[in-house]
């Protein structure tokens, strides 16, 4: 079976455009709020409303996919995101922006659930790792290019919103030329998110997504602060963050390929061990370039491999519900990780950022080793 089919390629093309729009807005909204001289707590509330929307969107998208299919769910998700974008220019103010960012958060989460579920349902045990690797490469590449766009174009609110909205609507176009079949609508069986979270044989995958959220959320959110406290200029901080993200992009396809060939368990063990090594190396400050590179290459690839593990433990009609559970787990981890790490850094030492990352990774490594005898390699239901 050919891995990158026409529907998959068109889906990833649409995702790239949507991710560009997401990256641009996520950066500029904070700047617009700062320019409006809003208090810090209000800026935090607007940011939190977006992530709250992510949680809400994650919860009901599975039902939507079951009712109207992948294509229409994708169209609806994109339109909701576009509405959240346009609303920022129609109504200005704390409460209105908090509402519009909540709506945008719902749309973004719906997009992620639809795309990830469609890829999982399109794949088999032999190529799901590569499909998810391609997904993450497109996502991080879109995020990276979005940051470049922010630095090259006008940042004025009414200048940005028209072309960003146009980019969102353009992201719909590729899927107008293909149809992604949802086999879940052809069965009477249904699964809930809670049932997937309780599924014992998939627990390693769920836990892996939580750990991935903690690791990536902490690195994304607090690494610039850590570097700033080391006395680095903004240009240097940007360079080192680019090294981190670039390593994550470059590591996706090899990790996905290795996971398909040698099994998820072995690759997960190696990834987590490398994250621990990278964290320890950052504490020594001996060689930041290789330390950051291996930390990014291993840390940014945990999520797709853990997701592939969990999805191989369920039946085909349960894939959408499982994907919702995994994305929810990742989101929870990405919210809790930075909050806890920031508290440790403020009260004790900046080095606790990497100590925390190494600690949670070590706990997950123990889980992987302990369960090795029970589930040596997951077998997919295809």
Swiss-Prot record:
Localization per record: Cell inner membrane
CDD domains: MFS_YcaD_like (cd17477)
Keywords linked to the UniProt accession: Cell inner membrane, Cell membrane, Membrane, Transmembrane, Transmembrane helix, Transport
Transmembrane intervals: 14-34, 45-65, 75-95, 102-122, 131-151, 157-177, 204-224, 231-251, 270-290, 291-311, 325-345, 349-369
UniProt superkingdom: Bacteria
Major location category of this protein: membrane
InterPro entries per the UniProt record, alphabetical: MFS, MFS_dom, MFS_trans_sf, MFS_YcaD, MFS_YcaD-like
NCBIfam families in UniProt: PRK03633.1 (NF002962)
Protein name, UniProt field: Uncharacterized MFS-type transporter YcaD
Underlying gene: ycaD
């Amino acid at each position: 079976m050919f891995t990158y089919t026409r529907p998959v390629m068109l889906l990833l093309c649409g995702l790239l455009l949507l991710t560009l729009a997401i990256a641009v807005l996520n950066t500029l909204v904070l700047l617009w709020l700062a320019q409006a001289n809003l208090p810090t707590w209000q800026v935090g509330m607007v940011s939190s409303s977006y992530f709250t929307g992510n949680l809400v969107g994650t919860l009901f998208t599975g039902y939507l996919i079951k009712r109207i299919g992948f294509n229409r769910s994708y169209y609806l998700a994109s339109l909701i995101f576009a509405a959240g974008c346009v609303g920022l220019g129609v109504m200005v103010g704390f409460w209105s922006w908090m509402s519009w960012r909540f709506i945008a958060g719902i749309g973004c989460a719906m997009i992620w659930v639809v795309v990830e579920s469609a890829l999982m349902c399109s794949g088999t045990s032999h190529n799901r790792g590569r499909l998810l690797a391609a997904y993450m490469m497109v996502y991080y590449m879109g995020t990276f290019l979005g940051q470049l766009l922010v630095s090259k174009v006008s940042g004025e609110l009414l200048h940005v919103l028209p072309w960003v909205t146009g980019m969102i609507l353009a992201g719909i176009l590729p899927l107008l030329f293909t149809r992604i079949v949802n086999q879940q609508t052809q069965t009477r069986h249904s699964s809930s998110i809670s049932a997937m979270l309780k599924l014992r044989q998939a627990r390693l995958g769920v836990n892996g997504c939580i750990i991935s959220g903690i690791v990536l959320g902490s690195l994304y959110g607090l690494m610039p602060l850590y570097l700033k406290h080391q006395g680095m200029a903004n240009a240097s901080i940007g360079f080192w963050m680019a090294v981190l993200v670039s390593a994550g992009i470059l590591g996706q396809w090899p990790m996905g390929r290795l996971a398909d060939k040698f099994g998820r368990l072995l690759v997960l063990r190696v990834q987590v061990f490398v994250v621990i090594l990278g964290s320890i190396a950052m504490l020594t400050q001996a060689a930041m370039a290789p330390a950051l590179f291996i930390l990014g290459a291993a840390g940014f690839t945990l999520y797709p491999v853990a997701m592939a593990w969990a999805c191989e433990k369920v039946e085909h009609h349960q894939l959408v519900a499982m994907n919702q559970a995994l994305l929810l787990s990742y989101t929870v981890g990405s919210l809790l990780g930075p909050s806890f790490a920031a508290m440790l850094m403020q009260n004790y030492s900046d080095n606790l950022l990497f100590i925390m990352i190494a600690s949670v990774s070590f706990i997950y490594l123990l889980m992987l080793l302990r369960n090795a005898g029970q589930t040596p390699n997951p077998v997919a239901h295809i």
